[in-house]
Amino acid sequence: MLMVATSEKALRNAVQALGEKIELKDLGEPKYILGLEVKRDKTQGTISINQKKYIGEVLKRYGMENSKPVSTPIELGLAQEKTAGQREEKSLIGSLMYLVQGTRPDIAFAVNYLSEFSKNFTIQHWSMAKRVLRYLQGTCEACITYTAGKEPMMGYTNASWNEVATGSSRSAYVFTVCGAAVTWKSKKQPIVALSTCEAEYVALTEAMKEGSWLNNFFQELCLNKYSPGTITIKCDNQSAIKMIKNPVQNQRSKHINLKYLYLRNQVENGNFTVEYLPTEFMIADALTKPMPRAKNLYCAKGCGLFF
């Protein structure tokens, strides 16, 4: 059982009260839990989380512990054609998914993309998966670091439009608190967006749903300083921002499903505000498509992930 509180006194009181009800043993501050290594620096006011040990186990399981590292998890210019030959490696995708959900937003796009082929995993996909492992080999020391007193919740959202193979777009969002990401996602959109504006609109809707949940979660924990009255979400598509602020339907927006108009209501009610951020500074960009080394590193650092 992991227990947290706003002060050490409150934590001691909670442990004492619980100990009167059930038998328990206080193991002190967590060092390793559910595959996550936790390091706390009280002097610097930071908490760092990494999965170095788990990464080592995955690399050894697939014979990649001595592989040559690469600087990005997935190559630019994805090959869309399928090659012959099947590989059943669903367990590898599951292992990589656990890393994505834990501390590695930098491999979210690559792993999500590979998971779409889990029923038809070819030699080509196995080669792509091995590249992810080689990337992890070179970045196994990476940790997400949260710093007390830094900025409250901030959201970033992005979308890639019209993937060649399917015509679908991909949504991504990242929410940061205390200088690092606390929740992130990369997912293929369930519709075929007819423009980049529409794809960004769909991505913003998903981000606001996640932001609403996160805001409520912080309020339940009485962490109101990290839960602003109005949550800011950064977006790099000015057309989508204008469409949010203009409730009048036009030829470009009248076909959009009502469920994606949820975000207009959220903005009008003051729960969210959407601000423009140039693409070169968008940290959610690496969760929608392959990135060159410099941009991949920039996005990782923006998520509080340091190698």
Which residues does each predicted region cover?
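Divalent metal-binding acidic/histidine catalytic loops
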Residues: 44-46, 50, 54-307
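Acidic, low-complexity central loop/insert segments
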Residues: 2-57, 65-66
